[in-house]
UniProtKB/Swiss-Prot annotation:
<feature type="binding site">
    <location>
        <position position="11"/>
    </location>
    <ligand>
        <name>substrate</name>
    </ligand>
</feature>
<dbReference type="GO" id="GO:0046167">
    <property type="term" value="P:glycerol-3-phosphate biosynthetic process"/>
</dbReference>
<feature type="binding site">
    <location>
        <position position="85"/>
    </location>
    <ligand>
        <name>substrate</name>
    </ligand>
</feature>
<feature type="binding site">
    <location>
        <position position="15"/>
    </location>
    <ligand>
        <name>ATP</name>
    </ligand>
</feature>
<dbReference type="Pfam" id="PF02782">
    <property type="entry name" value="FGGY_C"/>
</dbReference>
<comment type="similarity">
    <text>Belongs to the FGGY kinase family.</text>
</comment>
<feature type="binding site">
    <location>
        <position position="268"/>
    </location>
    <ligand>
        <name>ATP</name>
    </ligand>
</feature>
<dbReference type="InterPro" id="IPR005999">
    <property type="entry name" value="Glycerol_kin"/>
</dbReference>
<dbReference type="InterPro" id="IPR042018">
    <property type="entry name" value="GK1-3_metazoan-type"/>
</dbReference>
<dbReference type="GO" id="GO:0005739">
    <property type="term" value="C:mitochondrion"/>
</dbReference>
<keyword id="KW-0418">Kinase</keyword>
<keyword id="KW-0547">Nucleotide-binding</keyword>
<dbReference type="GO" id="GO:0019563">
    <property type="term" value="P:glycerol catabolic process"/>
</dbReference>
<dbReference type="GO" id="GO:0006071">
    <property type="term" value="P:glycerol metabolic process"/>
</dbReference>
<feature type="binding site">
    <location>
        <position position="140"/>
    </location>
    <ligand>
        <name>substrate</name>
    </ligand>
</feature>
<comment type="pathway">
    <text>Polyol metabolism; glycerol degradation via glycerol kinase pathway; sn-glycerol 3-phosphate from glycerol: step 1/1.</text>
</comment>
<dbReference type="InterPro" id="IPR043129">
    <property type="entry name" value="ATPase_NBD"/>
</dbReference>
């Protein structure tokens, strides 16, 4: 038996998962929730040591479960990493200790730094470097987070002066802690705002513009090769041989390996990736151009257009924790099925701004259309619809950017929210596309495990593609007139939320 394993470190939890190479079947796993810290409004941090410690604990617990099944840990032939992207960590090379909390991708503290950077560009535009990086100048990406750390954390400047400063996204931190290798993969590097997308190298121009030292950045490697081996613990000697940003890992897990194939992940936020092949397309419609994957140093880089949404599972959590409308996410479906519509209510849950296609970090959440008959059921249904509306806007942007009029006819979806069948029906109706759910629920983990297996030569792409991935398919039940009217109303609601925090 060949087992492929994956570390999946996300905004909500750390996981370690073990899959059968031949079938993709999940053999066993362990998950530990991780804390998000909110020291100020708009600030979101995590403890880097907690991220590492929970990963190590998940590995140990999973190995215990594996052995209880009568399976030896020796059957694990490779490990891949899927990680929350953009989240930025600085640490001391000598002590191995973080110099500050991880600044999470959702964090907006660098909004003023983004404005200042935009004002220094020749075009006075957030898109000054989009042709080179595929990204706008925005607080979402790592470059501005690192700049803030240099400006505000004296320990960072001291470590740099002493030649001990290390910086990376979560993948780099974990791989370094587990193997000693100081690397990132090309998919994660493409999320920093420091990568030249065409050369796949750190950009001297961008590092100089943001006043960041290029020499502290990790080595860029492909998504599937041996970076190092576990240096201690129950996996000692096992190759760590795959790495993908979590959304790219989901794209691989869904088998979106050919141009035009598209997936949408509903995690804390919402992330749509459309495979665009080996030539990057720079979006004119508010999408990001990002690296999808590269399976080996000598293989071509495959790119993707990405819609990144700030609205996702965090909306359900908000309804549970802040409004107390539900005590458990599982209550949402029954509650929402008890009403026919939202009674005219529209919920724009832009708590930390809006991403694709608006890129407005000053947008804030709003509920419109409340009347004396509005109940919590209507607000909950409006929340589910908000997530689907956001995805519909992403699909429209993708299709406008795709050359040759390519249509996205099917959307492959994953994430915690798709357990709600009503939500899948809502997606199909609002987007006017077939919605396909996967057999494998841990799709990001599976994608990372496959990358690790390819990197360690334990599985081939052909073997992977022979496996069936589809579970259920939902088809639209509403017509185009209904869809157009609803989307127009949604866009009107979004307008009201934009610019609020200026």
């Amino acid at each position: 038996m060949v087992l492929l394993a994956a570390i999946d470190q996300g905004t909500s939890s750390s996981r370690f998962l073990v899959f059968e190479a031949d079938t993709g079947e999940l053999v066993t796993s362990h998950q530990i929730e991780v804390r998000q810290l909110f020291p100020h409004g708009g600030w979101v941090e995590m403890d880097p040591m907690e991220l590492y410690d929970t990963v190590v604990s998940c590995i140990s617990k999973t190995i215990e479960k594996l052995e209880n099944l009568g399976i030896s840990a020796d059957e694990i032939k490779s490990v891949g990493v899927a990680n929350q992207r953009e989240t930025s960590i600085v640490w001391d090379k000598e002590t191995g200790k973080p110099l500050y909390n991880a600044i999470v991708w959702l964090d907006t503290r660098t909004s003023s730094l983004a404005d200042e950077a935009i004002s220094r560009t020749a075009s006075k535009s957030k898109d000054e470097f989009r042709a080179k990086t595929g990204l706008p100048i925005h607080p979402y990406f790592s470059a501005l987070k690192l700049k803030w750390l240099f400006q505000n954390v004296p320990e960072v400047k001291k470590a740099y002066a002493d030649g001990n400063l290390m910086f990376g996204t979560v993948d780099t931190w974990l791989i370094w802690k587990l193997t000693g290798a100081y690397v990132t993969d090309v998919s994660n590097a493409s999320r920093t705002l420091l990568l030249d997308l065409h050369k796949r190298k750190w950009s001297t121009q961008l590092c100089e513009f943001f006043d960041l030292p290029i020499e502290i950045l990790p080595e860029i490697r492909s998504s599937a090769e041996v970076y190092g081996h576990f240096d201690k613990g129950p996996l000692e000697g096992v190759p760590l041989s795959g790495c993908l940003g979590d959304q790219q890992a989901a794209m691989v897990g869904h088998q979106c390996l050919n141009a035009g194939q598209t997936k949408n992940t509903y995690g804390t936020g919402t992330f749509m990736l459309c495979n665009i092949g080996t030539r990057p397309i720079i979006s004119k419609n508010g999408l990001l151009t990002t690296v999808g994957f590269q399976f080996g140093a000598d293989s071509p880089v495959v790119y993707a257009l990405e819609g990144s949404g700030s609205i996702g599972g965090n909306v359900v959590r908000f309804l549970r924790d802040n409004f107390k409308f539900i005590s458990d996410a599982k209550e949402m479906e029954g509650l929402c099925r008890s009403v026919e519509d939202t009674s005219g209510a529209y919920f724009v849950p832009s708590f930390t701004g809006l991403y694709t296609p608006y890129w407005d970090s000053t947008a804030r959440g709003t509920i419109l259309g409340l009347t004396q008959v509005t109940q919590r059921e209507h607000i909950c249904l409006a929340a589910l619809r908000a997530v689907a509306f956001q995805s519909a806007e992403m699909i429209a942007a993708v299709e406008q950017d795709l050359e040759g009029g390519t249509k996205v006819t099917t959307l492959k979806v994953d994430g915690g929210m798709i357990a709600n069948k009503l939500f899948n029906e809502i997606q199909a109706d609002i987007m006017g596309r077939d919605i396909v759910t996967p057999k494998i629920t841990e799709i990001s983990g599976w994608g990372a495990a496959v990358a690790g297996g390819i990197g360690a030569q334990q599985i081939s792409l052909d073997e992977f593609l022979q496996q069936s991935s589809e579970d259920n398919r939902y088809t639209p039940q509403k017509d185009d007139n209904w869809r157009s009217a609803e989307l127009a109303r949604w866009k009107e609601a979004v307008k009201r939320s934009c610019g609020w925090a200026q």
